[in-house]
Amino acid sequence: MPLDGVKNIVLVLSGKGGVGKSSVTLQLALTFCLQGRSVGILDVDLTGPSIPRLVGLEDAKITQAPGGWLPVTVHPFHTPSSDGLNGSQRANKPDDSNESSSSTVETAPQSTNFCGSLRCMSLGFLLRDRGDAVIWRGPKKTAMIRQFLTDVLWGETDYLLIDTPPGTSDEHIALAEQLLTIQQTYSLRSSRATAPKLAGAVLVTTPQAISTSDVRKEINFCVKTRIPVLGVIENMSGYTCPCCGEVSNVFSRGGGQIMAQETGVRFLGAVPIDVGFGEMVEGWKKDSTGQDQGNKATKKGQDARLDSYDDLLVERYKKCWSFSVFEEFAKKLIGLIEGSDQQ
């Protein structure tokens, strides 16, 4: 069945392009992983897929399995070597079941000593050349969305984040219709398999009025398609000088929070521009074996495997100052989706 093993689906939407929606998707995915959840990213921005570049796997190719496509692995389930756990502790893999809690957002599930796996699927992996333009009409886009949602073998996945194109286009309509069809298909099955939960949408905006006005249209889209709005993230909310620490409001200030208050949706928080994150995704790339091209380690066996974890994108991301901001977003969202938020 489509999406067997996927527990929760979260859409990431934006009204305008260039607001950092794909980078927000990736950072949410990485912080979900660091909360011990297994995560998948489905990139349905068909004409401008960004996820392969952001994860440093532009040259990766999709593997065809008997039951469908296998998504590209960004990193496996692992325990970072810096955690200092011994072999027996590593062997005791925790249960990934989403336990509900009676705590509020402020006491949402804490970080674990384990990092969940991250896999991704994008049209960018299927193009013959990464510079090829995708010039498709609506029916072909709809067919591709349907295939992404029915033919990808995600396996056990706690969260599937769907990175969408800006606005409300053919991709969004096809996505909403296909997810509804999948829900109906599961309801007709006599087996014990449960349908993936469409947890809701995270909306991304920048502070300017021209961006927040288009996000209002996204909220209206969610209302009409009955997709819950989990919250709004204001991205690029100022620039922090690396020398003096002064914050300059390059793109106005507070527009996302004001819009959230006026529309009655949750404001998750604001994220200033993180130069370190940009340098990380621009200057880091894996080779065809999945290893960091800059990693010259020659160790073999278990030690080499553990050392390689420190070179993973998720481990490098923890050094970016925006990690702490997105960690709070992840805890809030996990609390909302898994039932630990009583608000």
From Swiss-Prot:
Binding annotation for ATP: G15, K16, G17, G18, V19, G20, K21, S22
Superkingdom assignment: Eukaryota
Chain segments carrying region Disordered: 80-110
Keyword terms, alphabetized: 4Fe-4S, ATP-binding, Cytoplasm, Iron, Iron-sulfur, Metal-binding, Nucleotide-binding
Gene Ontology cellular-component annotations: cytosol
A Pfam family annotated for this UniProt entry: ParA
Bias (Polar residues): 80-91, 99-110
A molecular function GO annotation: 4 iron, 4 sulfur cluster binding
Annotated compartments: Cytoplasm
Binding site for [4Fe-4S] cluster: C241, C244
Primary subcellular site in the record, as a coarse category: cytoplasm
Cofactor: [4Fe-4S] cluster
Cofactor binding note: Binds 4 [4Fe-4S] clusters per heterotetramer. Contains two stable clusters in the N-termini of NBP35 and two labile, bridging clusters between subunits of the NBP35-CFD1 heterotetramer.
Biological processes, Gene Ontology terms: iron-sulfur cluster assembly
Physiological role: Component of the cytosolic iron-sulfur (Fe/S) protein assembly (CIA) machinery. Required for maturation of extramitochondrial Fe-S proteins. The NBP35-CFD1 heterotetramer forms a Fe-S scaffold complex, mediating the de novo assembly of an Fe-S cluster and its transfer to target apoproteins.
Family indicated by similarity: Belongs to the Mrp/NBP35 ATP-binding proteins family. NUBP2/CFD1 subfamily.
Assembly and interaction partners: Heterotetramer of 2 NBP35 and 2 CFD1 chains.
Annotated protein name in UniProt: Cytosolic Fe-S cluster assembly factor CFD1
Taxonomic source organism: Coccidioides immitis (strain RS)
Taxonomic classification: Eukaryota, Fungi, Dikarya, Ascomycota, Pezizomycotina
